[in-house]
């Protein structure tokens, strides 16, 4: 976590969609990039389900159906994959619940579930302010507040410290409640505490950590329950323990438990024997406990003022959600403002990055021209941008053999084929019962080599991959992916010859050549990385880069320092026939993360044919039928086409990124049959989803041009390609 002075809070000020009413006592969970909020309230209890997309900054109200639960507050709310469970809470003043509901978020379908009672004893009583934590296939319920009175208007509070275990069925439904026999001293009764579960990587014993809460007075004690031995203990901690509090939030990211907000003593820590020890206030203090070392670290103290409104104001009863390494905070009771008949609640949404982002995937090529690249990389969740850099050493630009022959070298690495294209498979099958909606995946960069059947044609290692973008595609993420059709049993759809899948391939790298660039740039020293720029999205059109100032090896910044002023730097154009190395790093509120692995691409050389386009794959009795359209820019007469299949070899097993290709077709036709026997030797590429890889290239009078790569996704990697 960044030092306290480097905390970079962000308030989300621009969003769309129906924003939920400000409230307190609500709960939130995360499903991938979605923050899902339910319950809570202020002037009445809310019963809507609100969803916030952290990528698009959009709020929406899903159309839920089924056994829709009543609105509740201070309830239990956990997420298991795409299943959400709601337990208990206050449904109206003085009336609490012990009902359990399940939401299948993939269908927005609610269902009321009825778990079996414990083998001995009663099920949990109605309550609010309890903790409800998930680990594996079990939920753990601890403590809360019950109403002893049968009359909801006559509230007689009873603090609880009971402990229940709820076993879940796989996918949907529950088995029942049980009351585990625990050892050691049980924590005192409480409500509005927090409980999280953490398991060290090197020792597989999960622990539940309970912190704070309310039992007539606020608490600051920390308890640990070993979920294997069911032993309670009070771990000894180091550092400054946060003030006693309730209605705070606790979130685990990595090995840290982050505590934010809540009700704390009004006079700080010196409240013993004070006449004001019953006065309380909201706080915006922020601390974390290292769960491996049991050491507390204060990031924002209770006494630390915020005159610039640069972080969330004091609050309680808010929600906090961890998405990746980013924490989101929404709403809650305002710590200062008051109203006659209701609390004043915060309307703001904040987030805080707790770590620098991880390295993105290698830069992947979509399109190459003589003086530009269109590149992409896989998205990194919860980042604010990407720094793209390139490196080139023009003194070491390698010449290649004559590019007039088919690319069918035997074994070994073939530099021109370092990068495969990204493909989109458009399903043209009209029968919706046989295929599901396509799923998206990206093709990662990789090296490769070629292997062919005996052939009288000369070997050539000068062919690389490039093809133009399809004219009807856009530059959004959906254009840079394979799409997979699967039946209900997770198999590839069997397509008859008359019903085909369309493949539009985007690109690969370009051919090496003996030609010398006509306008060479100034020679750069090796390992000098120049900025291409900072990009909001995970795609970039690269035609220029910024030259380094004299004496500098890199423009990378440390921490969250400002980015360079590119207007003061000189630009340099890309030149034909030149190899460029690329790397990319993600940026968030903590600064610039580590760079990706390197990728190398080469700008095109004029005169070679473009890549074949509109590739189609369909199954037939012999195997599969592979067809394509001629290049849109043949640059002369097309003399022949070559098609290749990535095959299994010991070399690929040792280095999966080094694909070996076998030529399966050479001729003038724009189609070929790939037999079942050939497919039996196919290599299954696991770069993203399991896939069989084909490459197709065209040859004119000057030689072979770049190839189009197609990844034929396999729904079940354990089955043969045609099973």
Swiss-Prot record:
Keywords: Cytoplasm, Kelch repeat, Nucleus, Repeat. Binds KMT2A/MLL1. Component of the MLL1/MLL complex, at least composed of KMT2A/MLL1, ASH2L, RBBP5, DPY30, WDR5, MEN1, HCFC1 and HCFC2. Interacts with TASOR. CDD domains: FN3. Residues 419-433 have a biased composition (Polar residues). It is found in: Cytoplasm; Nucleus. One of its GO terms (biological process) is antiviral innate immune response. It comes from the Eukaryota. This is Host cell factor 2. Residues 357-436, 516-606, 608-720 form the Fibronectin type-III domain. Its main location: cytoplasm. Pfam families: Kelch_HCF (PF13854). One of its GO terms (cellular component) is MLL1/2 complex. Residues 398-472 are annotated as: Disordered. Kelch repeats lie at residues 34-79, 83-130, 207-255, 257-305. One of its GO terms (molecular function) is transcription coactivator activity. It comes from Rattus norvegicus.
């Amino acid at each position: 976590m960044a030092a306290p002075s480097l905390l970079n809070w962000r308030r989300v000020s621009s969003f769309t969609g129906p924003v939920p009413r400000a409230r307190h006592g609500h709960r939130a969970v995360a499903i991938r990039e979605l923050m899902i909020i339910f319950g809570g309230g202020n002037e009445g209890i809310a019963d809507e389900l609100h969803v916030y997309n952290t990528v698009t900054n959009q709020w929406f109200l899903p159309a839920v159906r089924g056994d829709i639960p009543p609105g509740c507050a201070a309830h239990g709310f956990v997420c298991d994959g795409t299943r959400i469970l709601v337990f208990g809470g206050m449904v109206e003043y003085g009336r609490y619940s012990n009902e359990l509901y399940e939401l299948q978020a993939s269908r927005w379908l609610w269902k009321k579930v009825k778990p079996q009672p414990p083998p001995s004893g009663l099920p949990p009583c109605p309550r609010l302010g309890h903790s409800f934590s998930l680990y594996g296939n079990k939920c753990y319920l601890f403590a809360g507040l019950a109403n002893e009175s049968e009359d909801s208007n006559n509230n007689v509070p009873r603090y609880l410290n009971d402990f229940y275990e709820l076993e879940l069925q796989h996918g949907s439904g529950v088995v029942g409640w049980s009351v585990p026999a625990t050892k050691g001293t049980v924590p005192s009764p409480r409500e509005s505490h927090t409980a999280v579960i953490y398991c060290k990587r090197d020792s597989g014993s999960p622990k539940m950590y309970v912190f704070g809460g309310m039992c007539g007075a606020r608490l600051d004690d920390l308890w640990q329950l070993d979920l294997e031995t069911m032993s309670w203990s009070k771990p000894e901690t180091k550092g400054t323990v946060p003030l006693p509090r309730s209605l705070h939030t606790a979130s685990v990211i990595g090995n840290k438990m982050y505590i934010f907000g809540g009700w704390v003593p009004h006079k700080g820590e010196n409240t013993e024997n004070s006449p004001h020890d019953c006065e309380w206030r909201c706080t915006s203090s922020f601390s974390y406990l290292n769960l491996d070392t049991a050491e507390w670290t204060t990031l924002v103290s209770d006494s630390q003022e915020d005159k610039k409104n640069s972080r969330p104001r004091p609050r309680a009863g808010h929600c906090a959600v961890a998405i990746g390494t980013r924490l989101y905070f929404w709403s809650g009771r305002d710590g200062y403002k008051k109203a006659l008949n209701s609390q004043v609640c915060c309307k703001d949404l904040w987030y805080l990055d707790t770590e620098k982002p991880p390295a993105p995937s290698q830069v992947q090529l979509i399109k190459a021209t003589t003086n530009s690249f269109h590149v992409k990389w896989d998205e990194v969740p919860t980042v604010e941008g990407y720094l793209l850099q390139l490196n080139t050493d023009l003194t070491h630009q390698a010449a290649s053999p004559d590019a007039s022959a088919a690319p069918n070298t035997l074994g070994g690495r073939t530099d021109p084929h370092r990068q495969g294209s990204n493909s989109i498979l458009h399903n043209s099958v009209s029968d919706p019962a046989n295929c599901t909606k396509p799923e998206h995946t990206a093709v990662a960069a990789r090296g490769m080599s070629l292997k062919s059947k005996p052939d009288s044609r000369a070997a050539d290692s000068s062919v690389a991959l490039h093809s133009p973008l399809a004219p009807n595609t856009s530059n959004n993420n959906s254009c840079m992916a394979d799409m997979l059709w699967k039946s209900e049993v997770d198999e590839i759809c069997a397509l008859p010859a008359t019903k085909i899948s369309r493949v539009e391939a985007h690109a690969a790298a370009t051919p090496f050549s003996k030609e010398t660039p006509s306008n060479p740039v100034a020679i750069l020293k090796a390992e000098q990385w120049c900025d291409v720029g900072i990009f909001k999205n995970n795609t970039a059109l690269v035609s220029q880069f910024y030259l380094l100032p004299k004496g500098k090896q890199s423009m990378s910044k440390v921490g969250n320092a400002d980015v360079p002023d590119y207007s003061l730097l000189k630009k340099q154009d890309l030149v034909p026939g030149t190899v460029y190395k690329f790397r990319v790093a993600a940026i968030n509120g903590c600064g610039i993360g580590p760079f990706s692995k390197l990728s190398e691409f080469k700008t095109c050389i004029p005169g070679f044919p473009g890549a074949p386009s509109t590739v189609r794959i369909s199954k037939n009795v012999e195997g599969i039928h592979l067809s394509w359209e001629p290049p849109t820019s043949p640059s002369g007469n097309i003399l022949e086409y070559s098609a290749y299949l990535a095959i299994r070899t010991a070399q690929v097993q040792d280095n999966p990124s080094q694909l070996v290709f076998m030529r399966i077709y050479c001729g003038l036709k724009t189609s070929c049959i790939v037999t079942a026997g050939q497919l039996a030797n196919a290599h299954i590429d696991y770069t993203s989803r399991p896939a069989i890889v084909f490459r197709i290239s065209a040859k004119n009078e000057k030689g072979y041009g770049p190839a189009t790569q197609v990844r034929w996704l396999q729904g079940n990697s354990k089955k043969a390609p045609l099973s």
